[in-house]
Structure formats: C-alpha cells, structure tokens
Amino acid sequence: NRVAFAKMASTLADGKSRLLRKIAGDLDHGGKQVLKPDSTGYKILARFVRRVSGKPDDGPAVADYDAPPFFDGVEMMPPQRLLRRITLSLAARLPTKDERAAVERDGLEAVNSILDSVMKDDAFYDRLQEAFNDILLVRGYDGGGEGALSYEHFKTRLWYQDRSPRKGLSPEKQRELFPYSHPKMIAYTKLVNDYREGMLREPLELIAHIVRNERPFTEIVTADYIMVSPYTARGYGVYDELQDKFNDPDDPFEFIPTKIKSLTDRNGRKVQESATGFFPHAGLLSSFQYLKRYPTTETNRNRLRVRMYFLHFLGIDLMQLAPRVNDAAAITAQYEIPTMQAADCVVCHKVMDPVAGLLQDYYVVDGKGIYGPRKDGWYKDMFAPGLENEGLPDNERWRSLQWLGERTAKDPRFPVAMVEHVWYILTGRKPLLPPEDIDDPLFSAKRRAYRVQRDETERIADVFVEADFNLKVAFKELVQSPYYRVDGLASTVNNPRRRAELDDVGLVRLLTPEQLERKLTAVFGQEWGRLTHRESKFKILYGGIDSKAVTERMTDPSGAMGAIQRIMSNDVACKNVALDFSREPSDRLLFPNIDLSVVPGGDAEAKARIRQAIVHLHQRLLGRE
C-alpha cells in the first residue's frame, strides 16, 4: 500500500504533485476538496510527498514539543487518604483501625489485601450493581419489573394478584374494606414492589454473582443461567422446584442461579426450538430485562440492540464510526437496497446487520415480552446473520446468542471494554477518546494524553485476562495505578501543551446522590434520606438518573445542587450534633472528648480539648490529619 501511495504521490500534474492537487480540489474529481492548502493535514501530506520524491525535508508540520515523563510534577495521594477513598467509594464505610494501622506500617503494599476484604463486603456489591446500571441502564425499561416477561410465555408473571386482599371484591367494597392505608394493603403493596424490584435487579445480580464468586467475567455474555429470587422465581413459574434451594424463601432479594426451560405458550405448546430443552441463556445478551430495555421496531430491525452490544461489550460506538452521507436522498434513489449496495451505507451495515440477524428470534415489536420470531421470516434485504465475516451455521440458529457470546468472550476488545467500565466506576469519567481535530494546536498533547491512558488501560486488560477475567483484579490494578492515586500538581503548569496533557488527570468528581447518602451514613452513623428515598424529589435535581428519561449523571454542579447542599448541611449538622451529645462520650462519633465543662475561652485544658475536637472532626469529615 505504501509503495502504491508513494507512486501516486510522485505523479505530476502541471509540474505539481497530482495527489496534492486533487486533495486540494484543484483537479476535477468526485472527492472534491478534502484538505485546505493551509491545513495541518495538507502540510503533513506535502511533507510526505517531498520525502518520497527525494526532496529535502523542511521540518515537521507541527512544532516539536519536548514532553517530560507523563506524571512528572504530579503528586500522588498519601496511602492513608487513598485508603479512605477506597473504603468510602467501594464499601461505603470509613477505614477500620486495623486497616489504618496496616497502611501506616506497610504503605501501598497493604492496600492489596485490604481491597480483598473490601470486595467481600455486601456494600461493594450494592455499589457494583448501581455502577453497572449507570452503564447498562437496564433498570429503565417500560412496563414495571414484570413487563420483561410475556403473558403468553409466563402465565404466572402476575402471581401476586392472587394475594391481594381486594381479590374478588367489588370496587366499592375494595375501597371500603381495604383502603391503601389498611395494614394488609400496605403489606400487599410492599410485596408487589419487592417483586418488581427483584425483576429489575436480576441482570445486575448476575454481575454481582460472577464477581463475588470470582468467576470469569466473560460470563456476562456466556452464562447459561439466570439469577432468580423467591419472588421472581414465581414469575417464571419455577418456584416449586427451587424453593428448597433458598436459605429464606420469604426473602425477596436472595438470588440463586438457575435455568428455565425452553418457552411454551399458555397452553403448553412448544414455541421455542432447543436441542437441550432449556432456554439458550447467554448472560446479559439473552436477558429478558436487557432486551426489554433496548426494544426493536419494524424499521429499527434490532439495530439499536446491536449498537448497545458493541458499546457495552466491545467498547465501540458504531455511531461515531459511521461516515456522514452527503446526500441520503440521492443514494436512496440510486440503489434498490442502499444498506447492501451503497458504499457509504455498507461500511456500517456490513458490521451491524449480521448481528441484528442473530437477534431475530427476539423480535417482539408490541412491547409484550421479548421472545418471538418475525412472522414473515427474517428480512432478505439485510446481510445474513453472523459476526464480522463469520456466518451463523444453520444448526446454531436456535442458540444464536450463545454463539455470539462465545465469540465476544474471545474478542480482544472485550477485556479492554470491561476495564474501561471499571475506569468509569472508579473515576466517574469515561476514558479519553482519540482527538480528531488535527488542526488543533494542542492536538499532539491531547493525543499523548489519550495514548498514555490507553496504554494503562491495555496493560490492566492484559493482567485481567491473565487472571482468568477476574474483575476484582481489574479493580485492584486500577486502584493502585497513578491515575487513581493522583492528588494534584506539585507546582503551577504554564505550558499550554502540558496543561492539555494533564487536563483529564485527577479524581475531582461529584458524588452521586446514592454515594453522598452512603458517605453521610459512614461519617455520621445515619443517612440523611432525602436524596434517595423512593418519593424524594431531590434525587434527579442532585444529578441522579432514572435509567429511562434521565440517563446521564451530572458532572458539573448546578444552582439546584447548591440549594440542596445548604438544606442538607443544616439538617445533618443540627440533627447529628444534638444526637451525638445525647450519647455517652465513649460512644460518640463527632465529639468524644467534649462535655458540659468545656467552653470556649476556658482554661488551658478546655482549649486543648477544643483543638483536639477540631482535629478529630477534620480527620473524620475530610480525611485529613
């Protein structure tokens, strides 16, 4: 390719490189002007033409920059503050005395074993599920929790209705005998809400199960099972066969792995082909909730699901890779099937449409469940089912998503994408994308920042793979990397290129409403409650999401957030200071050495105890000695 391109560059037109003239739009050709003569891209190409033509090089198109080592002048967080960051972020608690002592003694070397302990806490798995929902938004589908199950295939999905105290009563009697304030109606409402919450949690419980048991994280696309609770098992119609496997059959949030049988209709007739007799589970790929969250239509033809597949599991946003079509109307008029014939369309649809075909058995367009092949068969005006030039064998059709999951797990892009998810969980920011504007004077600095970060991501991905895809290893590697430990700059940076390199380095971020509530609980011993309560109006205002209409966490503070912070500071301070003084001094969290005899302006001992209390508060609230 280089030889052919060099030959083309050496060809002259009116004494000037034909390549340079065409690309500048001087010659009549279909591509028109591609680069302006004064652009950086043109200068780089002109330099290449001179070099292959044997002419002297007049220097780089962009001035050289003598870059220092990337983290030169960047200060790292002391081990004790790093420990506090880890335990608050991942386990919603302050470090224990033993953990602080271990770090004081062994420094960063102690962090590894402490992380092992942190990642056994239930709070870590709450955080893990919450964070992966931020990425997958799987809780945001329409129709309530049981809406993921079709009434046609799961006739017990509304099992809770048989337990309603209002069952069999007329509307008048229902309101008269069992108003919503009646204890039985309150209990019934809780049962329904717990069932729906369990259904919403199922895909996230799969993630937690894989990580908790240190199973290969590839199982998020290959697991031949789902997670069910005593309540959701009733929805699937499998509770009777599983009830002895639950530790507490009345716990709506105890989840165990199981398989469900291939689907039948309400009359028991087989509607799903299966060589094993079971539903062909493939982790999240075949999850009822995941497919319900990303539905399809007659015009979309599973392409939304394909976009999410590439984004969530391979780290590729197909929309960013798609070329911009100059004249869509002209292409539509010129080709009978543009998506299979027009070069501008084929470049994307050749990748997208075969994967869409793998989902053809999950083609419900009326919002009722997710399973059901298209009545008229799959579309003929789309590329055949498969993945990246590998066609789906006919005998694998019944398990097409398992076939896809097996190949996804072997794709080298999968571990990188998973490490990028961990990056987002820990930093609250998405990894850098390669800069595109080559004319940007800071392009080389931004490219270096991207490349160094990408190298670290790929390094961690390699360690992740060597550890048999144990996601805990990815967390441990990233927590101990310079990116997570950055604490600030040793001195002011004046060079604009250096500032551009370090622009995304550091961990200044807004806590989510859920994280802030957990931090308040860890510091003060009880939650505030007004950020995450079911009926709270503050959650969205403070940057929360509902996974449906609001899907992006806020990264910049707003006026509403400032107002909420003022309300919170007054509430938390008034409530917890008074509560702390009602306890015995030895049980206090905030003022362990202050009693009624200690007053400002008192004797030397009182002044010393006040100073000691300020130091204690500074350490407990801010984590600074």
What kind of feature is each model-predicted range?
Residues 56-77, 83-93, 98-121, 361-389, ...:
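Substrate/cofactor-recognition hotspot
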Residues 19, 82-90, 114-119, 128-136, ...:
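Short alpha-helical scaffolding segments that buttress acidic/His motifs in well-ordered protein cores
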Residues 74-83, 107-110, 120, 124, ...:
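Secondary-structure capping and boundary motifs in well-ordered enzyme cores
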Residues 33-34, 61-62, 97-102, 128-134, ...:
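Short coil/turn segments at secondary-structure boundaries
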Residues 1, 13-16, 21, 27-45, ...:
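Sequence context surrounding c-type heme c attachment/ligation sites in exported
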Residues 129-236, 240, 250-262, 269-276, ...:
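Non-catalytic, conformational "gating/processing" segments within enzyme and secreted inhibitor domains
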Residues 55, 93-97, 124-126, 137-145, ...:
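Secretory-pathway/luminal and periplasmic proteins that interact with or process carbohydrate-rich
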